[in-house]
């Protein structure tokens, strides 16, 4: 999205959500000074928090990651959710650094964890401050993470199947693990397909198969391969999911 498109989208979302649920907005990058400038000069009205990804490409040290998020926490007018996704950034933020940030800054309130490292995730969940939340950043491990103590997910598949996937999350959070597990297994093949050609392309293909949108993306993203599209359509048909 261009800067102007982001402003339009933000305005639309603030109006549509109308305070019914907390609204997170992405604000991150690998140029700390630029992120801090955006936080200080941007319009954050109607936004309840920011989701800030680990700096990508630079491959910062653990101390570099700490200092990056320290600067963001000190500049942000709203709460900060850390985002650890080494598969996209090229760097993993350790449990130690995540916990250090959680303890040192009251406005760092959560982490979206997509490392897939269950030992690391357990370390964070076990040792975190009481008022710091762990959110899954990977749909496929959301159910097991909630059983370990995570409190939710920032989802990909939820863009296409919000009702059913959020039902699974609510069931798990309420301790109804048996029925939550049924939904988890029901979607297991879709979870895997999300990564075959990239999850942006996959969720777009899902919405297209449901008759909701055109199967179009902006470069450098392209639609899924035909074989992937056919598998997605077949699974949705088997699950009797349609718009």
Question: Residues of each region from the PLM?
Answer:
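A general structural signal for well-ordered alpha-helical segments in protein cores
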Residues: 6, 10, 35, 98, ...
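Conserved, mostly hydrophobic/aromatic
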Residues: 13, 42, 72, 111, ...
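Flexible C-terminal active-site loop/helix
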Residues: 212-243
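A non-catalytic, amphipathic alpha-helix used as a structural packing/dimerization or gating element
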Residues: 5-8, 12, 37, 71, ...
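Active-site beta->alpha loop and helix N-cap motifs at the rims of alpha/beta catalytic domains
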Residues: 1-90, 100
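Catalytic alpha/beta core domains of metabolic enzymes, predominantly
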Residues: 74-75, 88-195
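Glycine-rich phosphate-binding "P-loop"
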Residues: 84-85, 107-108, 218-219
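Conserved short secondary-structure transition element at the edge of the structured enzyme core
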Residues: 147-149, 188-222
């Amino acid at each position: 999205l261009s800067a102007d498109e982001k402003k339009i989208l933000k305005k639309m979302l603030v109006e549509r959500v109308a305070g019914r649920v907390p609204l997170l907005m992405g604000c991150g990058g690998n140029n700390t000074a630029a992120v801090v400038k955006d936080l200080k000069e941007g319009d954050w009205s109607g936004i309840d928090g920011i989701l800030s990804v680990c700096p990508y490409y630079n491959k910062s040290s653990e101390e570099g990651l700490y200092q990056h998020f320290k600067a963001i926490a000190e500049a942000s007018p709203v709460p900060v959710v850390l985002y650890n996704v080494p598969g996209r950034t090229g760097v993993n933020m350790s449990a130690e650094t995540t916990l250090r940030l959680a303890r040192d800054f009251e406005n760092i309130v959560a982490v979206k964890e997509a490392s897939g490292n269950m030992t690391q995730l357990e370390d964070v969940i076990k040792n975190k401050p009481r008022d710091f939340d762990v959110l899954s950043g990977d749909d496929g491990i959301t159910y097991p993470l909630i059983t370990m103590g995570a409190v939710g997910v920032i989802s990909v598949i939820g863009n296409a199947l919000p009702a059913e996937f959020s039902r699974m999350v609510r069931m798990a959070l309420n301790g109804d693990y048996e029925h939550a597990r049924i939904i988890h297994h029901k979607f297991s093949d879709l979870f895997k397909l999300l990564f075959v050609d990239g999850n942006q392309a996959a969720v777009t293909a899902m919405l297209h198969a449901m008759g909701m949108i055109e199967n179009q993306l902006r470069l450098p993203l392209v639609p899924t391969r035909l074989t992937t599209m056919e598998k997605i359509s077949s699974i949705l048909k088997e699950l009797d999911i349609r718009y």
